[in-house]
C-alpha cells in the first residue's frame, strides 16, 4: 500500500485577484515557496512532494501520521496569506490513492469555496506496513542530442512532450509521473515490473523518438525508495548493467520504524 496526501490551497484563484490582480512575479514566487516548504516539511519525515499545478500538490507520505499533517498545515497558516486543505488516502497503486484523496477533499466543497478552509481528513487508513516504489526516469544523452544542439526552448519542448507521453503511459498502469527538473522524472509506480517499463519505453521511443532509462527503488518510505531509484539510475549511467531498467529493493530489516516528533525548520 502507498499513502498519498493531496494538498490544495484554499480559495486560491479568487485570492489572486482580490481586491485587484496581484503581481504575477509575486504569485510565482509564492507558489514556488510553498512547494519548497512542502518538500522540506514532508521530507523531514521521509516524504516527498510534487508540485503538479502548484496550487495542488501531491505528496507521498508513507509513515507520516495525522498529527504531523496537522502541524504542517498550521505552519502554512502561520506563514502564508492563505491556508491549505489536505486529504490522505492509501491504495495498492499511486493513482488509486491520489484518486481517493482527491475525492475526499472534493466532498468538502469547491476549491474556490470561501467557506471551505483547512480541511484535514483521512479517506481510509494510515499505512503502517506498506511500501513505496519509485522510478527515476531520464532521457538518454539529452546533452549531446538536444541541449548542445537545439535552442533552450526547443529542448524544453521536447522534454515536455516526453513528459506528457510518459504520464499517459504510466496512467495505464495506475501509476503517476512528475517532472523533477532537467530531463528527469519521478514516477510512483507500485505494482509495475521492469518488463512493464521496457515495453512502455519502447512505445515512447516509437512515438517520440526519445530513449529513456530508469532506476527503480522499493522502500518503506518515499525517501528510501527515491534514494534506491537514484542509485539504480547511476548503475545504468555508469554502464554497470546492459539493461535500461535496474531495480533495487530495501532490506526489510535495514530501517526500523522511527516516530518523528520534530518539524523541519524553514
UniProtKB/Swiss-Prot annotation:
InterPro entries attached to this UniProt entry: GTP_CycHdrlase_3, Nucleotide_cyclase, Rev_trsase/Diguanyl_cyclase
Keywords (A to Z) from UniProt: GTP-binding, Hydrolase, Nucleotide-binding
A Pfam cross-reference name: GCH_III
GO molecular-function term, one example from the UniProt record: GTP cyclohydrolase IIa activity
Catalysed reactions listed for this entry: GTP + 3 H2O = 2-amino-5-formylamino-6-(5-phospho-D-ribosylamino)pyrimidin-4(3H)-one + 2 phosphate + 2 H(+)
A biological-process GO annotation: biosynthetic process
Enzyme Commission number: 3.5.4.29
Domain of life of the organism encoding this protein: Archaea
TM region(s), chain numbering: none
Family: Belongs to the archaeal-type GTP cyclohydrolase family.
Function of the protein: Catalyzes the formation of 2-amino-5-formylamino-6-ribofuranosylamino-4(3H)-pyrimidinone ribonucleotide monophosphate and inorganic phosphate from GTP. Also has an independent pyrophosphate phosphohydrolase activity.
Protein known as: GTP cyclohydrolase III
Species classification: Archaea, Methanobacteriati, Methanobacteriota, Methanomada group, Methanococci
Record gene name: gch3
Amino acid at each position: 500500500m502507498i499513502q498519498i496526501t493531496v494538498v490544495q490551497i484554499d480559495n486560491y484563484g479568487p485570492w489572486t485577484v482580490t481586491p485587484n490582480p496581484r503581481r504575477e512575479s509575486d504569485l510565482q514566487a509564492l507558489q514556488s515557496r510553498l512547494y519548497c516548504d512542502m518538500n522540506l516539511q514532508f521530507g523531514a519525515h521521509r516524504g516527498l512532494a510534487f508540485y503538479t499545478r502548484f496550487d495542488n500538490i501531491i505528496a507521498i507520505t508513507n509513515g507520516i501520521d495525522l498529527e504531523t499533517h496537522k502541524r504542517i498545515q498550521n505552519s502554512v497558516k502561520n506563514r502564508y496569506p492563505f491556508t491549505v486543505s489536505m486529504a490522505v488516502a492509501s491504495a495498492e497503486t499511486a493513482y488509486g490513492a491520489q484518486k481517493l484523496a482527491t475525492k475526499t477533499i472534493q466532498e468538502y466543497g469547491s476549491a474556490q469555496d470561501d467557506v471551505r478552509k483547512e480541511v484535514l481528513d483521512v479517506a481510509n487508513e494510515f499505512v503502517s506496513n506498506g511500501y513505496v516504489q519509485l522510478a527515476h526516469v531520464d532521457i538518454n544523452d539529452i546533452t549531446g542530442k538536444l541541449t548542445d544542439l537545439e535552442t533552450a526552448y526547443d529542448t524544453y519542448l521536447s522534454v515536455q512532450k516526453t513528459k506528457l507521453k510518459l504520464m499517459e503511459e504510466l496512467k495505464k498502469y495506475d501509476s503517476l509521473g512528475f517532472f523533477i527538473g532537467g530531463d528527469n522524472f519521478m514516477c510512483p509506480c507500485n505494482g509495475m515490473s521492469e518488463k512493464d517499463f521496457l515495453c512502455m519505453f519502447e512505445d515512447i521511443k516509437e512515438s517520440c523518438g526519445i530513449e529513456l532509462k530508469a532506476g527503480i527503488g522499493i522502500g518503506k518510505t518515499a525517501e528510501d525508495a527515491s534514494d534506491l531509484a537514484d542509485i539504480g539510475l547511476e548503475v545504468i549511467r555508469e554502464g554497470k548493467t546492459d539493461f535500461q531498467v535496474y531495480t533495487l529493493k530495501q532490506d526489510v530489516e535495514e530501517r526500523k520504524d522511527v516516530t518523528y516528533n520534530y518539524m523541519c525548520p524553514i
